[in-house]
Amino acid sequence: MSESLYIDASGYTFAHEHLHIDLSSFKNNIDCRLDQYDLICGEMKTLYALGVRNIIEMTNRYMGRNPQFMLDIMRDTGMNVMACTGYYQHDFYPAHVVSTPTEKLAQEMINEIEIGIEGTELKAGIIAEIGSSVDVITPDEAKMFAAAAIAHRETGRPISTHTSFSTMGLEQLALLKNHGVELSRVVIGHCDLKDNLDNIFRMIDLGAYVQFDTIGKNNYYPDEKRVAMLGEIARRGLLDHVMLSMDITRRSHLKGNGGPGFDYLLTTFVPLLLEAGFTQADVDLMLRDNPSVFFK
């Protein structure tokens, strides 16, 4: 389990989460340092009791990743945590990214998949979250997508992306396809932050998966609209290309700090889906079956 290259297909998977992340220096806000072990450990135990078996952890290089924290969570809760490798988005790149050759960036990712992360036994199971800016893919971001493609071709591990406010998903897919990536091995993140159905249908038609992974962040986009968009996807028979998550990133998101907590997805959002006419099989498809296929 400690290598986390595979997931437990018997339970649910939260496809885009953070257990330890620190963007506080970028955002000048201590709330953006998610590191409270006891609270997070408690929430993972709650999720485990609700049938969740896997957390796909999206904190990559220079985002405050902590591999020992993840290993401890697995040991203390039984939850499987799949770690990632890569770089996030232009505004968060360290200075050396600009001058580092694409091939070297790719090799860093390959090493974290095949050897381990920062000297630990934890190996990355996914290349993520590879990001783009709002309405643009910068040249350095394009270089990072190229590096991710090389790492994918070398290791076979899937790619999970970050779109800023649900923009540039189609452009990300075009870039990855040009670099030889089979799009069925790509999931486009944060597709649920605006009215986005036309693009979602086009991305699924290209073979990619899409994530509704900011569930509960009603200040960005209301969950009722997420349910409505998922309803349209269901009516077209395309839920087999959808995965769900919450993208917890702040201390204030944790239940112990007054936030919704990780279990909001199951205790609040899933009931909204069922009330809207979704079946339990639909829920299982998005939370269990699709991740079991994609993250294999």
Regions from the language model: what does each represent?
Residues D72-R75, N80-T155, Y209, T214-N219:
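Active-site gating/metal-coordination segments in enzymes
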Residues R153-E232, V242:
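Catalytic pocket-lining loop regions of alpha/beta-barrel enzymes
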Residues H16, I55, Y87, H152, ...:
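Divalent metal-coordination and catalytic microenvironments
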Residues Y12-F14, R53-N54, N80-M82, A124-I126, ...:
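Structural preference for beta-strand elements that scaffold enzyme active sites
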Residues M1-L5, Y264-K296:
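Mid-to-C-terminal alpha-helical segments outside catalytic/metal-binding sites
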Residues L23-K27, P67, Y93, G169-A174, ...:
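Histidine/acidic-residue-rich catalytic or RNA/ligand-binding cores of hydrolases
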Residues M58, D213-T214, L238-G259:
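Short acidic/histidine-rich active-site segments
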Residues S10-A15, H20, N29-N80, E103-L122:
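Alpha-helical scaffold segments that flank or form the walls of functional sites
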